[in-house]
Amino acid sequence: DYASYMNGLSRKLTARNCELFYMSVNPCNTAMKSTRKESEIRGFNNRLRQRLNGNFTCINSYSYLMRCGYTSRCEFRGYTDDGVHYSMRTYKRIYAYAIKQIR
C-alpha cells in the first residue's frame, strides 16, 4: 500500500539526511465532479496521516483550503469549473502555504 511504500522510502532518504514532507489530497468541487467524494478524500488523508512513520511532516493543505476557501473555476480552461482544477489564485495560495510549512 501507499503508506508502506512511503515508509520504506523514508528510511533510505533519512539515512541521507533528507527532510521529508507530504501534502494532503486537496478538496474538489463535488457538485461538478460527482465521482469524487469529500468523505473519500478525508478518509484517504486520515489513513495516510495515521500510517506514515514519524519521518514525515504533513502539509495539510486540505484543511487549509477548507478553512480559507478555494475556487475550482479555472482560468486555463476558459473559466470552466470541472471540479478538480483550481483558479490561479487558489494555486498560488496552495504554493504559499506549502512554502510556509516547509520553511
Cite the ranges covered by each PLM segment.
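Surface-exposed amphipathic alpha-helices with a cationic face
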Residues: 7-14
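Glycine-rich anion/phosphate-binding loops
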Residues: 1-6
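Catalytic His-Asp segment of secreted/periplasmic serine-dependent ester chemistry enzymes
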Residues: 26-103
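A short helix->loop->beta-strand "cap" motif at the edges of active sites that frequently abuts
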Residues: 15-20
